[in-house]
Amino acid sequence: MSSEFAATWLPAVFVPLIGLVTPAVFIVLIGRYITATD
């Protein structure tokens, strides 16, 4: 794998991945917090 390939390919994968995973993790943490304090 060349560095040029990684430079074009990694952001294209990680940006949407982070955009989907971050809210999902946030929701899970809130859900656990709510159930733990309930």
UniProtKB/Swiss-Prot annotation:
Main location, first listed in the record: membrane
Record's GO cellular component terms: photosystem I; plasma membrane-derived thylakoid membrane
Any single Pfam family the record assigns to this protein: PSI_8
Membrane topology: Single-pass membrane protein
Location of the protein in the cell: Cellular thylakoid membrane
Stretches that traverse the bilayer: 12-32
Record's keyword terms, sorted: Membrane, Photosynthesis, Photosystem I, Thylakoid, Transmembrane, Transmembrane helix
GO BP annotations listed: photosynthesis
InterPro entries: PSI_PsaI, PSI_PsaI_sf
Similarity-based family: Belongs to the PsaI family.
Function noted in UniProt: May help in the organization of the PsaL subunit.
NCBIfam families on file: PRK11877.1, PS_I_psaI
UniProt-recorded name of the protein: Photosystem I reaction center subunit VIII
Natural source organism: Prochlorococcus marinus (strain SARG / CCMP1375 / SS120)
Gene that encodes the chain: psaI
